[in-house]
Swiss-Prot record:
This is 16S rRNA aminocarboxypropyltransferase. It is found in: Cytoplasm. It is an enzyme of class 2 (transferase). Belongs to the TDD superfamily. TSR3 family. It comes from Methanosarcina barkeri (strain Fusaro / DSM 804).
Length: 173
């Protein structure tokens, strides 16, 4: 993966091999050289932030995200089984705040984001809107995610820390 400019945040995917390869957003991002794909947990970069829907601390600009962001590309039915394995790695686990999925599989469902949406949300919140748009541009439904979540994403991007993210989130549900 080559960031297109020096300020792009490195994106990493742990691919659990549970999805349809033709519909896999993680694989597609790797094909376009927007993210690096890993099939072994042991090879993930230890200094990156793992987006984890099972934790309470929200991702915010206060986090040290320069070393990259990791998403777990797996079936939502397997999340409860796979994340405990990742907990052993001593990564910085952060959750994304309340957002609606814009993809055709989980459209309009809160928190049920796919890998591309998770990356885009994190990038947007961290002030890397152009990189977020670049990630979503590879999917014909990508604009739907941004349209559905425009207002909360803009507000989350103004937060300084996790506490403020959670406070803003409380306005949306």
């Amino acid at each position: 993966m080559n960031p297109t400019n020096q300020r792009d945040i490195p994106l990493y995917i742990y691919h659990a091999g549970q999805c349809d390869p033709k519909k896999c957003t993680g694989r597609k991002l790797a094909r376009f050289d927007l993210a690096r794909l890993y099939d072994r947990i042991s090879r993930l970069p230890r200094s990156a932030i793992l987006l984890d829907p099972t934790v309470e601390k929200a991702l915010s600009p206060a986090d040290d995200y320069k070393k990259g962001i990791i998403v777990l590309d797996c079936s939502w039915e397997e999340v409860e089984r796979v994340f405990p394995d990742l907990a052993k790695l001593n990564l910085k686990h952060r959750a994304l705040p309340y957002l609606l999925a814009g993809n055709p599989v989980n459209f309009g469902r809160p928190f049920k984001l796919n890998s591309a949406e998770a990356f885009a949300a994190a990038l947007y919140i961290l002030g890397h809107k152009e990189q977020a748009e670049k990630v979503l541009s590879k999917f014909n439904w990508g604009h739907s995610f941004l349209e559905l979540n425009k207002e909360p994403l803009e507000e989350y991007a103004t937060a300084k820390n996790s506490t403020e993210i959670v406070e803003i989130q409380s306005h949306y549900f």
